[in-house]
């Protein structure tokens, strides 16, 4: 492997500090309101990404992108057939998780990482039932991306009776403990190790790409058996950062356009409270997953780390976002008494993650978008007569005949747009926040 290029940012040197990394990007989401999984959703996600290519960037060779990726629901039927070739029987949908893992190319280091992964799976009361090396086509990559691309494997993890949120929580703890253990026991040689996703609901395909290279690199994304009811995409523009495989988005729950200007304070606040944190759902596991924020991660990655913790501790994704990106709620702003009380209460728990931000997010069921309270990044939406919703940094990422458009608009500062694929409907900002601020 050519160590001139790495999958992570370089160490602090001179005036450069990786802690100051930000990026400005293109984001998008597509969802079938009915919740029906279809390969068309994957194709639409790829099309959105292609039409956001101008919001991304390339490095000096002009064929290595800053990063692109797609997040979608686990394609159960696809994996069922793929693993059947190796005589591996998957359990029912939702009864297992899939870890999408970037591994170092050095055989010995990769073997050590895999050994630790299997050890942590067993320690969590789960069971590794199969693995699959993800098919990739390196010929589409630029020299820089090709020199540092990892080996990419999918690990299939039996829930041993756990499903739903319980399994998601167990997989979250397993992943965090694994990450800490790899850093502690292997260290620098395992810099290229990264778990892009470990979930029973969603999976992330991403890398150091320009938008057209994503589907070319991952043939899975062109397989008609790969189906989903939702997809989130991201094209990265590293304004003052180094491109890397691990910092490509989407992360595990979000794709983010903008920058978190309060990042250092947010990370310090989390670190200060880690010893005092408690959770009836996470219990003693909480002490094993700290630090919450991965070392060397970007501002978007740190945001995702925090949001993931809040969701796994029992809050809904919209609730977590309301805590992290509150609306303007000072005395001059006209909001309900309940909502103001909610924001004032949570202000004592969570420092706002302030800065220009447009975020699309999903927990595998809900899909939505939100803006920072100043509305400093754009997010537009389209609802079609075919029950499709498109959220993106700009209009026109997918063209529809005017007669097929039921509704279109833009997100307002601090507001949220939400689709529930189980209830099969769009939920307004007032409704979702009204329920959250009144719940006990």
Where are these regions (language model features)?
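Conserved short alpha-helical segments that host acidic/polar catalytic motifs at enzyme active sites
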Residues: 2-440
């Amino acid at each position: 492997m050519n160590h001139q290029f790495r999958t992570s940012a370089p160490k602090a040197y001179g005036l450069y500090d990786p802690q100051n990394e930000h990026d400005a990007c293109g984001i998008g989401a597509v969802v079938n309101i009915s919740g029906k999984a279809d390969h068309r959703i994957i194709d639409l996600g790829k099309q959105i990404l292609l039409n956001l290519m101008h919001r991304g960037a390339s490095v000096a060779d002009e064929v290595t992108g800053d990063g692109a990726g797609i997040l979608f629901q686990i394609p159960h039927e696809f994996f069922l057939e793929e693993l059947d070739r190796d005589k591996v029987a998957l359990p029912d949908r939702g009864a297992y998780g899939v870890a999408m893992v970037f591994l170092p190319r050095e055989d010995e280091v990769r073997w050590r990482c895999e050994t630790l992964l299997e050890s942590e799976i067993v320690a969590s009361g789960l069971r590794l039932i199969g693995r699959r090396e993800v098919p990739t086509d390196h010929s589409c990559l630029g020299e820089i991306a090709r020199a540092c691309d990892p080996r990419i494997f999918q690990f299939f993890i039996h829930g041993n009776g756990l499903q739903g949120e319980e399994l998601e929580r167990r997989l979250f703890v397993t992943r965090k403990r694994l990450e800490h253990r790899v850093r502690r026991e292997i260290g620098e040689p395992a810099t290229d190790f990264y778990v892009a996703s470990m979930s029973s609901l969603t999976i992330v395909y991403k890398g150091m790409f320009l938008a057209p290279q994503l589907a070319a690199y991952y043939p899975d994304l062109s397989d008609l058996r790969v189906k989903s009811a939702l997809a989130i995409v991201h094209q990265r523009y590293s304004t003052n950062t180094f491109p890397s495989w691990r910092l490509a988005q989407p992360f595990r729950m979000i794709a983010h356009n903008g920058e978190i200007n309060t990042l250092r304070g947010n990370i310090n606040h989390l670190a200060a409270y880690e010893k005092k944190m408690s959770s009836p759902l996470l219990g003693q596991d909480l002490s094993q997953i700290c630090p919450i924020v991965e070392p060397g991660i970007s501002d978007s990655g740190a945001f995702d780390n925090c949001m993931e913790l809040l969701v796994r501790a029992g809050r809904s994704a919209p609730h977590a976002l309301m805590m992290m990106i509150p609306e303007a709620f000072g005395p001059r702003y006209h909001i309900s008494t309940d909502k103001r009380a909610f924001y004032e209460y949570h202000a004592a728990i969570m420092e706002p993650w302030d800065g220009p931000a447009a975020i699309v997010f999903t927990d595998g069921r809900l899909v939505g978008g939100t803006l920072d309270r100043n509305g400093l990044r754009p997010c537009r939406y389209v609802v079609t007569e075919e029950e499709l919703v498109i959220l993106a940094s700009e209009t026109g990422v997918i063209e529809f005949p005017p007669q097929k458009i039921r509704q279109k608009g833009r997100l307002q500062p601090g507001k949220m747009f939400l689709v529930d694929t189980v209830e099969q409907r769009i939920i307004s900002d007032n409704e979702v926040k009204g329920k959250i601020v009144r719940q006990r």
